[in-house]
């Protein structure tokens, strides 16, 4: 089953420790059913010094969260909503807000 959340979507966490937080999707992991959201679900990683990380040490970064725990925030009505798909008369597919019926973006 495909994910209805895409990279750069604004989403709101609807359950769990970070309930109510809003952030932008940095990456989707469709095989795992997870997404990585900016500013949500930080974990600490022990990083060995390498060329990329000169100092190393303990680094905080975002960890994946299940996609079923987030909802897309509609850019038109600014409410968390389910996402539907619709085919326009021109033949192109678009994502649609289930609350206000407005087009979110192209698929």
UniProtKB/Swiss-Prot annotation:
Disulfide bridge partners, by residue number: none
Source organism superkingdom: Bacteria
The keyword Ribosomal protein is annotated on this UniProt entry: yes
One cellular component term from this protein's GO annotations in UniProt: ribonucleoprotein complex
SUPFAM superfamilies: Translation proteins SH3-like domain
InterPro entries from the UniProt entry: KOW, Rib_uL2_dom2, Ribosomal_uL24, Ribosomal_uL24_CS, Ribosomal_uL24_KOW, Translation_prot_SH3-like_sf
GO BP term (any one): translation
Alphabetical UniProt keywords: Ribonucleoprotein, Ribosomal protein, RNA-binding, rRNA-binding
GO molecular function: rRNA binding; structural constituent of ribosome
Signal peptide: none
Pfam families in alphabetical order: KOW, ribosomal_L24
Membership in a protein family: Belongs to the universal ribosomal protein uL24 family.
Subunit record text: Part of the 50S ribosomal subunit.
Task performed by this protein: One of two assembly initiator proteins, it binds directly to the 5'-end of the 23S rRNA, where it nucleates assembly of the 50S subunit.
Name of the protein this chain belongs to: Large ribosomal subunit protein uL24
Organism: Kosmotoga olearia (strain ATCC BAA-1733 / DSM 21960 / TBF 19.5.1)
Phylogenetic classification of the source organism: Bacteria, Thermotogati, Thermotogota, Thermotogae, Kosmotogales
